[in-house]
């Protein structure tokens, strides 16, 4: 019996791998929403807020995650995760798993709870990722302390802020900063966590551009045949057709790690 989970920020194309696993007779729990997320999510959300209490914000764009790797995991946290995953963990299916983007926010303790399962780290170019809203855009909703978006804009990108003369443009710019901060934070928490025994990184763009080759990698990793789903090429590189800012320089480290081009 194998257990699989997906790590990746919301609006990162994670529904593609969830739908692929569902099409491949992997039980992903029930009920599911259109994105292939296991519902209801409330216990997972509470688990995110519980873990966030042990993350130390060091100011600016730095967090200390170190105690997450050594402190006792609170019983309340494990109870919440077992509540959320009850249908998956008790299912008799040979291959099963779950997907919800908020798993990324609790990744350090999920790895400690489930060290032997198979993890798929699903990444997407943040320039596309920050164009649309997701529940994790404002990390304060999950107990995470991070810089105020308008203060950050004023100090690091004053020209962008000054150019947003229309209220709607300014509001969208602020949300893109928050989404970029969310992407950056989630990259940081994953990067700071010792990786489990079974770990693979897959770029959404590679899945869209060459599904056959990407699935071959995943089939070798998971040890099961995978079904094909319909993908749309226009989901890659949307930032080229979008108005407004889609890049902030604090994204550079993560983008380089995953091989994304840095705009000049």
Predicted regions and their residues:
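Short, hinge-like loop/turn segments at secondary-structure boundaries
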Residues: 47-49, 136-140, 218-220
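PAPS-dependent sulfotransferases, especially Golgi type II membrane carbohydrate sulfotransferases
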Residues: 1-5, 10, 22, 134, ...
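PAPS-dependent sulfotransferase catalytic core
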Residues: 1-80, 234-238
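Short aromatic-enriched loop/helix-cap "lid" or pocket-rim segments at secondary-structure transitions
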Residues: 110, 131-136, 141-145, 213-215
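Short His-Asn-centered micro-motif
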Residues: 7-8, 98-103, 123-124, 204
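Short catalytic/ligand-binding loop motif for oxyanion handling, primarily in non-cytosolic enzymes
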Residues: 15-18, 104-107, 127-132, 208-212
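Glycine-rich phosphate-binding loop used to anchor ATP phosphates in small-molecule kinases
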Residues: 76-107
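Conserved phosphate-donor/acceptor-positioning beta-strand/loop module used by diverse small-molecule
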Residues: 99-100, 110-135
């Amino acid at each position: 019996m194998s257990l699989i989970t997906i790590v990746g920020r919301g609006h990162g194309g994670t529904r593609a791998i969830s739908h692929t696993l569902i099409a491949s007779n992997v039980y992903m729990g029930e009920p599911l929403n259109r994105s292939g997320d296991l519902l209801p999510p409330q216990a997972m959300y509470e688990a995110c807020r519980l873990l966030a209490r042990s993350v130390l914000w060091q100011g600016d764009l730095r967090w200390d995650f170190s105690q997450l790797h050594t402190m006792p995991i609170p019983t309340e946290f494990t109870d919440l995760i077992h509540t959320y995953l009850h249908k998956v963990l008790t299912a008799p299916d040979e291959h099963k798993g779950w997907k919800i983007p908020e798993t990324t926010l609790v990744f350090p303790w999920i790895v400690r709870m489930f060290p032997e399962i198979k993890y798929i780290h699903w990444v997407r170019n943040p320039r596309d990722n920050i164009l649309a809203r997701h529940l994790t855009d404002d990390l304060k909703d999950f107990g995470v302390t991070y810089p105020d978006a308008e203060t950050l804009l004023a100090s690091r990108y004053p020209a962008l802020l000054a150019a947003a003369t229309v209220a709607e443009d300014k509001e969208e710019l602020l949300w893109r900063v928050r989404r970029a901060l969310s992407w950056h934070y989630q990259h940081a928490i994953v990067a700071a966590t010792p990786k489990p025994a079974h770990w693979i990184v897959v770029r959404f763009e590679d899945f869209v551009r060459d599904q056959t080759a990407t699935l071959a990698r995943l089939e070798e990793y998971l040890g099961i045949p995978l079904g094909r789903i319909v993908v749309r090429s226009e989901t890659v590189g949307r930032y080229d057709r979008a108005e407004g800012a889609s890049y902030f320089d604090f994204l550079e480290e993560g983008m380089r790690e995953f091989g994304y081009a840095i705009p000049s």
